[in-house]
């Protein structure tokens, strides 16, 4: 059953119950292993309890093990609640889930599909039809997850091609908090460019860490003179609050909050005295918190459709957070005729976060010999507290002429072998900048972004920058922006853009948006879109768009519409558009088929990790952990989105259930591994239901609240107002017992016979019958 410690769910366990001497009530008992899994420190228990635990096969109740410790059993929901003083709870990072609770799921397979067909009619160019089918197949066997992704395109012109995107087997390596991948996949692209490969890869997975230990956040250290309250804020927002004991304290489980803003720490002592200090907080993408590390190791062949052969390569990376200020990282790549090494680090200071790394590469090119080069990358991030200016990310990268990345090197080698020249275009430098400036008094926000790229063997550079302003007036949101772009050939253009958005009431989630844009060549576009849903659960949503384009002096008016239906088994979409010269129609179907031990279950599109619900006879019940999800006629439903290594709550709303079916519990929690398919079994009690109007033989009403039991003593319900009772789980005919005052003063028996059962219908009213409750001897 589920075990909840101090209002925090810790997992599902097999528990033993033992009766206490002189007490009929049995209590759950715990051994050292179970206490450890629950995060409880038995060294804080009473000496007598510690001595009992030291015995072989010891099992003691938590009640009485130390002051204020208690347990409460919720038998109906199969849940045990423990209340334990904080002194006996081991400290762990927030949202920590013991790996023993990670669920590998069941053996099952699935096929996820995305089918789209487009039809275009053009007055001068005729008709054209194209169809796309995307497939994602998987099979889970024990800890292994087998996956394949591919796509098929075909058209009425006879073009047809299936493309395999990735095929691999993957599993967790729990002690290393890592993933092992075998087959066709991709590298992460953290330090080096992302590569498609066929081979083997072992890499750490940050998702296995508690959410409070992911990403970068500084460790906050200080000293308290008493039992003190510590409040940590960032830009006026409270991030964390806790109580610490006298002496030095350390808080190392702050959630990462993006690119920063210094932390304001206030320590309030027991006598009301306060003292404050600040901790610098800014981060570039490769920053790690103190003591954290990441690594990857890949061995395989490079996959690139432009290459005639697939060279073998090996790549390794390592990152480590030395302390609050410094993170370091390094990496290497080796292949035939190629080698590179990278070394870098990041520094967090009061002036912001700085990152720098240098990559040295050596490439052998046919006819040109050995080429050596370097690539320097610089990055910076900072939030200026005085003005709240957010320099989200500024990066600069410069590569010398002799520098090649692995894919660049292999393509250049191939071009030189095949054509005798080097036609592959390579970057010389790249610069990006992003700024955001909130304005005081709710006057909106200014934002600026810019990028520039230059290339070897090409004069000129690509340049793009944009400045914009966004705000809202009551419920009307608006954005105004201006963009300028120039390519390396000197072609330039300016675009001015204005957009408005307005929600239209809350009943059906409707909104109206419009936009206008115009460029320096005189081309313009105006567009208005109405979106909404026909119900609050968004089973059916729609959009209608009207637009006018002016291009090279020609006007074109287009009217288009789209419709999306979300069902429990699939999503169906369609669109129509009509312009001056062109009309288009499309139809799409997205969904999945999940194969398991009891058959096939249809589903909405799946994410990497999803769950399978089984609730016998609960067809029609709504699953609240998603949109438009219902239990099917076989008692199964798929929850298409779960978060791996985190506690996920999955709930069923009994509304819509037949009155002849009762859910024993309406929610469960699961902690799935990445790619797992956990099975969530919701126990149900089936049987016919009825409202019985019954009185005692002398005409007196039955006592309000009296228990209604079957002949085996199982509780079926209770007597309500007006001597009516509602009972579920009945047979077509039989007897039920009404008992009050624990049977010491009254019992009576009702004999019933229900009308022939009609077809089970969700929400159908229970049968109404009249009867008399015949007295039976009272229990002593």
PLM region descriptions:
Residues 3, 220-222, 611-615, 688-697:
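A short, amphipathic beta-strand motif
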Residues 14, 628-636, 713-722:
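Short, acidic Ser/Thr/Gly-rich low-complexity loop/linker segments typical of extracellular
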Residues 88, 117-121, 143, 152-156, ...:
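Transmembrane beta-strands of outer-membrane beta-barrel pores
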Residues 101-104, 129-142, 163-175, 310-332, ...:
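Feature captures outer-membrane beta-barrel proteins of Gram-negative bacteria and organelles
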């Amino acid at each position: 059953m589920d075990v909840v410690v101090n209002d925090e769910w810790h997992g599902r366990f097999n528990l033993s119950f033992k009766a206490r001497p002189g007490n009929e009530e049995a209590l759950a008992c715990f051994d050292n292993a179970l206490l450890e899994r629950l995060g409880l420190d038995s060294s804080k228990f009473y000496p007598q309890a510690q001595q009992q635990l030291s015995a072989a096969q010891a099992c003691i109740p938590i009640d009485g093990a130390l002051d204020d410790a208690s347990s409460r059993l919720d038998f109906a929901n199969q849940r045990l609640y423990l209340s334990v003083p904080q002194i006996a709870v081991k400290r762990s990072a927030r949202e920590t889930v013991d790996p023993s609770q990670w669920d590998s799921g069941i053996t099952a397979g699935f096929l996820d599909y995305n089918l789209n067909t487009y039809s275009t009619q053009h007055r001068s160019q005729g008709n054209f039809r194209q169809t796309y089918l995307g497939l994602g197949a998987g099979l889970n066997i024990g800890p292994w997850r087998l996956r394949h992704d591919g796509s098929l395109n075909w058209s009425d012109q006879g073009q047809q091609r299936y493309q395999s995107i990735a095929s691999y087997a993957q599993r967790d390596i729990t002690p290393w908090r890592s993933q092992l991948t075998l087959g066709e996949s991709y590298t992460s692209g953290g330090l080096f460019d992302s590569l498609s490969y066929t081979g083997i890869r072992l890499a750490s997975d940050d998702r296995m860490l508690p959410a409070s230990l992911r990403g970068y956040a500084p460790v906050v250290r200080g000293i308290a003179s008493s039992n003190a309250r510590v409040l940590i804020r960032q830009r006026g927002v409270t991030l964390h609050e806790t109580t610490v004991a006298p002496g030095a304290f350390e808080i190392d489980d702050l959630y990462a909050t993006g690119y920063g803003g210094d932390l304001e720490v206030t320590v309030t002592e027991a006598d009301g005295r306060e003292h404050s200090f600040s901790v610098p907080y800014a981060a570039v993408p490769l920053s790690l918190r103190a003591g954290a590390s990441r690594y990857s190791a890949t061995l395989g062949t490079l996959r690139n459709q432009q290459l005639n052969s697939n060279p073998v390569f090996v790549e390794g990376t390592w990152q480590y957070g030395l302390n609050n200020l410094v993170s370091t990282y390094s990496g290497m790549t080796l292949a035939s005729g190629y080698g590179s090494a990278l070394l870098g680090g990041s520094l967090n200071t009061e002036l912001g976060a700085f990152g720098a790394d240098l990559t040295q590469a050596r490439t052998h090119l046919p006819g040109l010999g050995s080429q050596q080069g370097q690539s320097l990358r610089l990055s910076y991030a900072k939030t200026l507290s005085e003005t709240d200016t957010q320099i989200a990310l500024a990066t600069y990268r410069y590569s010398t002429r002799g520098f090649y990345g692995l894919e660049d090197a292999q393509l250049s080698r191939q071009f030189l072998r095949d054509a005798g020249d080097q036609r592959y275009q390579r970057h010389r430098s790249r610069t990006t900048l992003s700024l955001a400036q909130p304005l005081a008094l709710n006057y909106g926000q200014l934002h600026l972004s810019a990028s520039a790229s230059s290339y070897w063997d090409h004069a000129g550079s690509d340049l793009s920058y944009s400045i914009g302003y966004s705000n809202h007036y009551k419920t009307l949101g608006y954005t105004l922006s201006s963009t300028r772009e120039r390519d390396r050939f000197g072609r330039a253009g300016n675009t001015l853009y204005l957009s408005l958005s307005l929600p239209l009431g809350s009943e059906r989630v409707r909104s109206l948006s419009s936009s206008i844009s115009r460029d320096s060549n005189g081309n313009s576009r105006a567009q208005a879109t109405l979106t909404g849903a026909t119900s609050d659960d968004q089973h059916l949503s729609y959009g209608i768009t009207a637009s006018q384009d002016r291009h090279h002096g020609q006007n074109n008016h287009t009217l288009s519409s789209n419709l999306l239906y979300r069902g429990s088994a699939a999503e169906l979409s369609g669109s129509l558009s009509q312009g001056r010269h062109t009309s288009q129609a499309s139809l799409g179907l997205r969904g999945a088929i999940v194969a398991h031990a009891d058959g096939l279950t249809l589903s909405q599109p799946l994410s990497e990790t999803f769950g399978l619900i089984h609730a016998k006879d609960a067809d029609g019940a709504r699953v609240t952990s998603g949109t438009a999800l219902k239990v099917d006629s076989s008692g199964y439903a798929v929850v298409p989105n779960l978060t791996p290594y985190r506690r996920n709550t999955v709930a069923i709303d009994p509304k819509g259930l037949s009155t002849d079916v009762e859910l024993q519990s309406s929610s469960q929690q699961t902690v799935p591994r990445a790619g797992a398919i956990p099975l969530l079994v919701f126990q149900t009690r089936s049987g016919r239901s009825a409202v019985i109007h019954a009185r005692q033989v002398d005409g007196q009403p039955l006592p309000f609240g009296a228990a209604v039991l079957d002949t085996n003593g199982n509780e079926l319900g209770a007597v309500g107002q007006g001597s009516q009772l509602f009972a579920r789980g009945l047979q077509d005919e039989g007897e039920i017992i009404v008992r009050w005052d624990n049977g010491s003063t009254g019992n009576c028996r009702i004999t019933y016979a229900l009308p022939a059962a009609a077809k089970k219908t969700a929400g159908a009213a229970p049968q109404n019958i009249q009867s008399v409750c015949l007295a039976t001897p009272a229990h002593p």
